Amino acid sequence: MHLLPELASHHAVSIPELLVSRDERQARQHAWLKHHPVPLVSFTVVAPGPIKDSEVTRRIFNHRVTALRALATKQGWQIQEQAALVSASGPEGMLSIAAPARDLKLATIELEHSHPLGRLWDIDVLTPEGEILSRRDYSLPPRRCLLCEQSAAVCARGKTHQLTDLLNRMEALLNDVDACNVN
């Protein structure tokens, strides 16, 4: 289920392409749930800027696949089906996991908080009925920025940081994880 970093497209995606890609992901999620009636873990990489498919985003994606598989194994949850693909919005993955959706969401939130690359992961958990469980459902604060302690959404809207600073931070986090052999 891992993606080969050397095959990254480096395509600079436009806003309309990104919006279409998000709609397509939502349609894939609902089609997936019709064929796999257990909770769905759907995940992407948080990648600032127009290039969503790069060696860095694919390597981050691959770390997340490994971490999610390890989480399922640790919890004794069965992965019933899995898929990886690349869309205009970058690497995407889907795992059907036989586990209570609420437990899955809480475990993935903990993974996002505890893993060094967690801030770069966007992990959605959908119930078999298609309801997306949100961080807000658990009274959790929004994601924090990569560079400061503000809300990531506030910094993104205000363009608080230079894109190069964000991309350099992403790569530094990834290199640290690789150097320490963290999965």
From Swiss-Prot:
Role summary = Transfers 2-(5''-triphosphoribosyl)-3'-dephosphocoenzyme-A on a serine residue to the apo-acyl carrier protein (gamma chain) of the citrate lyase to yield holo-acyl carrier protein.
The record's Gene Ontology biological-process terms are:
prosthetic group biosynthetic process
According to its UniProt record, this protein's enzyme class is transferase
Q: Which family does it belong to?
A: Belongs to the CitX family.
Q: Which InterPro entries match?
A: CitX
Q: What is this protein called?
A: Apo-citrate lyase phosphoribosyl-dephospho-CoA transferase
Q: Which organism is it from?
A: Shigella flexneri serotype 5b (strain 8401)
E.C. number(s) listed in UniProt: 2.7.7.61
Q: What is the lineage of its organism?
A: Bacteria, Pseudomonadati, Pseudomonadota, Gammaproteobacteria, Enterobacterales
The entry lists its GO molecular-function terms as: holo-citrate lyase synthase activity
Its keywords, alphabetically, are: Nucleotidyltransferase, Transferase
Give the reactions, separated by semicolons, that this protein catalyses: apo-[citrate lyase ACP] + 2'-(5''-triphospho-alpha-D-ribosyl)-3'-dephospho-CoA = holo-[citrate lyase ACP] + diphosphate
